[in-house]
């Protein structure tokens, strides 16, 4: 009788132990997801908006490229009193499916596949990314060829990748595009760690600043994205409706119109 009870209780304890193990793994997984979700992104999207632009109309200036129109909109937007800073970029927004990749190598052997960020100087300030005040992205040199320019600014995640594999790696270490050791790529600074997505690891990006010349000559017909940060004291729940009614009509350039503006 005692043996039967022990056998019965043993099954109960085994079931309780199994439930404990399942609950432990479930709570641990949920805890990790919660930690990852609420861990700082490394940039700030409060008071940040993105323009949605369309082309249309029965007539247009054939001498103007897409680049001319995007730049016209950007320049008008930057003059708006409520706008703190604005930026134009190509395939480069965080939390976006638009991607452009290339591989940078050290000593032409140790390479890392990096997302290439092509953006104007205001990009890091729009998203309030961490950067060295003495070596800001906005002051970085510009070189032509958006796919293989000679100046980059690595994200901290990318720099850490190289540091783990190359003893003594620093901002002074020369790089090269993988398979092209003849052309040296110079590091111009570093952007503090951040994540592309809420559940992502530290991003491995390489930033390249583009100016009007690069935009007009190399990106003239490509589609761009424009984002901007509104001054905190001038942002409000009805800012979008005010923007579309009062500001958007003044930004339209040739046959490129502002269709919408959305919080990032």
Model-derived features: where do they sit?
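"Rare, low-scoring activations can occur
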Residues: 69, 149-150, 156-160, 179-264
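Short secondary-structure boundary/capping segments
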Residues: 2, 40-43, 142-144, 217-218
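Short, strongly hydrophobic transmembrane alpha-helices
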Residues: 6-35, 43
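Membrane-proximal extracellular/periplasmic loop immediately following the first transmembrane helix
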Residues: 27-111, 116
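A short amphipathic helical element positioned immediately N-terminal to and/or at the very start
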Residues: 1-3, 73
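Short beta-strand boundary microenvironments
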Residues: 75, 79-170, 183-199, 216
């Amino acid at each position: 009788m005692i043996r039967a009870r022990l056998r019965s209780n043993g099954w109960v304890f085994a079931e309780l132990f199994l439930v404990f193990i399942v609950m432990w793994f479930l709570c641990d997984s949920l805890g990790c997801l919660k930690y990852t979700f609420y861990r700082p992104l490394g940039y700030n999207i409060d008071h940040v908006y993105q323009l949605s632009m369309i082309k249309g109309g029965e007539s247009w200036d054939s001498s103007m490229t897409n680049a001319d129109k995007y730049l016209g909109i950007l320049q008008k937007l930057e003059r708006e009193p409520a706008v703190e800073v604005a930026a134009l970029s190509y395939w480069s927004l965080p939390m976006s499916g638009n991607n452009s990749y290339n591989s940078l190598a050290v000593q032409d052997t140790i390479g890392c596949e990096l997302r290439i960020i092509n953006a104007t100087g205001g990009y890091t300030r729009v998203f309030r990314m961490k950067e060295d005040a003495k070596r800001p992205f906005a002051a970085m040199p510009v070189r032509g060829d958006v796919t293989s320019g000679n100046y980059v600014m690595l994200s901290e995640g990318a720099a850490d990748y190289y540091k783990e594999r190359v003893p003594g790696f620093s901002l002074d270490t020369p790089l090269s595009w993988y398979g092209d050791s003849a052309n040296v790529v110079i590091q111009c600074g570093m952007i503090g760690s951040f994540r592309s997505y809420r559940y992502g690891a530290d991003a491995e990006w390489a930033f390249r600043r583009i100016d009007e010349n690069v935009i007009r000559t190399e990106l003239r017909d490509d589609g761009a994205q424009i984002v901007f940060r509104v001054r905190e004291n001038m942002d409000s729940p009805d800012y979008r409706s005010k923007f579309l009614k009062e500001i958007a009509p003044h930004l339209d350039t040739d046959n490129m119109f502002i269709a919408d503006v959305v919080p990032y």
